[in-house]
Amino acid sequence: FCLSRGLGDVYKRQIFSNANTILIPDPVYPVYLDTNIMCGRKIVYMDGKPENNFLPMPDDSVKADIVYLCSPNNPTGAVYTKEQLEAWVAYALKNDAVILYDAAYEAFVDDPAIPRSIFVVEDAKKCAIELCSLSKTAGFTGTRCGYTVVPHALVRKTESGKAMELNKMWLRRQTTKFNGVPYIIQRGAEAVSY
């Protein structure tokens, strides 16, 4: 768990290779797409359409390194069930992919059967990073305050083949490139209750 400026820190993806293949839902929150285009990564679109309730599911014919999921989705509002998230976790584990799970709108989920976190799925800690923003939860829009959960169990190989916890890489990135959320915003975030 790491306090951050919100989702933008991960979208810059300084802990992933520019050679990665990215799986992105369509329609999509523009930042997912644009930051990867700026890095020169290969983009593969997942077709969200009325027939699949705007919830694309894994396609075993596509090998991705990073998968973007947002639930509730921006811009459609569609939500994944636990069973659907289990299918995505199975896909990620099979393909050694990392799921970037955007939970910015999780506070709007009021059905206890709908997961508010990908970590309700067994083994998600081995393949997922969860991002959340207080912008939606507490009306903190524009304050750049959120958090990122990078489990210690999430291990991937570096370009040289060395196994590394992404948590350690993320912490190194944060301590090098992030000076912290301003104190007054931290105090406001502390006042948020669920």
How should these model regions be labeled?
Residues 1-11:
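Single conserved hydrophobic/aromatic residue that forms the stacking wall/gate
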Residues 8, 20, 65, 126, ...:
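Conserved acidic residues
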Residues 8-9, 28-32, 138:
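Conserved coil-to-alpha-helix start sites within the AMP-binding
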Residues 14-36:
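Conserved PLP-anchoring active-site segment centered on the Schiff-base-forming lysine
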Residues 20, 41, 94-98, 125-126:
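A short helix->loop->beta-strand "cap" motif at the edges of active sites that frequently abuts
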Residues 27, 103-105, 133-134:
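Short strand-turn motif at the edge of the Rossmann-like AdoMet-binding core
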Residues 44, 48-119:
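Active-site phosphate-binding strand-loop segment of PLP-dependent enzymes
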Residues 121-194:
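Conserved core segment of the aminotransferase class I/II
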